[in-house]
Amino acid sequence: MTMLALRLGLRSVDICNLRLSDICWKSGTISFVQQKTGQPLTLPFPVEVGNLLARYILEGRPKCDLPNVFITLKHPYTRLRSSRCYTSSLAILGRKKSAADVRGLHIARRTFASHLLAAGNPVSMISSTLGHADESTVDEYLATDGHRMRQCAIGLAGIELTGVLI
């Protein structure tokens, strides 16, 4: 689950709604309708993500007739809820959510966007890959790009501080 957010930028709700039929192994793509925007999205997945998905489906996913890729590990099986997506990912890794984990799986989505920007991809492509309906929505994701943010800083040379600084 974490790799789908980190390597494809998927929202947790879309990860939890992902169905086995949404994965095309021949073309190496995932196609689905986004929950938030209602827009269809098709993304290629890297081989490592495909291998992890295949391993989970074949070796980790409980055997059942549910169409969802990610399901609860205990009977009665149901699809995972997006509110449990991150904690379920941690549980698989043998970890627990800490009080500092306020963003959950969404931080992986931000990291994905920052990596695309650092690689020189245009904002329009990043926005499209994230499935945003409005290109300006991507700005909050890109604020984590410290290198480019430092280029926006204004120099303070020649400006004197007066008064008391508390």
Where are these regions (language model features)?
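Short pre-functional
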Residues: 1-11, 30, 114-115, 157
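A short, glycine-centered helix-capping/turn motif at helix boundaries
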Residues: 4-17, 119-121, 132
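Conserved tyrosine-mediated DNA breakage-rejoining catalytic core shared by Y-recombinases
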Residues: 8, 12-13, 17-51
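Short, polar N-cap/turn motifs at the start of nucleic acid-interacting alpha helices
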Residues: 22-25, 101-102, 121-140
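Catalytic-site neighborhood detector that most strongly recognizes the C-terminal catalytic loop/helix
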Residues: 34, 130-155
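Short, basic (Lys/Arg/His-rich) helix/loop patches that form interaction surfaces
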Residues: 43, 87-128
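Active-site/catalytic core of tyrosine-dependent DNA strand-transfer enzymes
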Residues: 47-100
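C-terminal secondary-structure termini that scaffold catalytic or DNA-interacting sites
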Residues: 157-166
